[in-house]
């Protein structure tokens, strides 16, 4: 019997061992590829995310506070830092979540409903704010609205019913808040709409009992956004935090009215950190 002959059982054992090794390598390679592709997709979508989450170098957002107070915080920040402003946007708007949709009929969550997942998000702006953002006039009558929407059904409708109140769709709009006002709800839902109404106070009063909320946003682009970016954000965070504490009734728990600070530097850093961590895991 020649010495170089391998028994059949030994050969089968080695083949099985090699097969397991190859399968393990294939699985690990697939995992690495999936991770790399995922990280690349996130990085490729970074620009869209930043436009949605942080359209300006520095910003202050308010919940259930007036626009004047929000703007004052930004003015204080600019005075303390000496940053030179190239562009500023200051707006007040409403937003609410859709509980149910039947064609063009919308049901809004009530004020007391908690821990809900909306089918869609709607942001509401006055026609004065629309003109401020676009330079264009709409001249809406009392029962008319203008609409930008990602909802396919709404795009073909002539009217819209919101909690039993009917509105005629005067015209369909382009994305008029892009690069001007953040829409963080894009992360939660892919279906969202922006309404323009003739009088935002009348619209808000017509939505009593619903979960509709009021928000403000003041964002600025500065001459040198990289100058002291982290230090500046820390200062803006401090200013917003102190102002929140001074709001009436804010003692314990999660406040109903509050200010929050944000910066493009911080948002971009979070995305880059997430991509870097994903690549490291891969």
Please provide the spans of the model-predicted regions.
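N-terminal Sec/SRP start-transfer signal
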Residues: 1-29
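Short, contiguous, pocket-lining structural segments
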Residues: 3, 34, 66
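Residue-level marker of positions within ordered structural domains that often coincide
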Residues: 16, 47, 225
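Hydrophobic alpha-helical transmembrane segments and immediately flanking/interface helices
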Residues: 32-58
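Basic-flanked hydrophobic alpha-helices used for secretion and membrane insertion
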Residues: 50, 56-63, 67-281
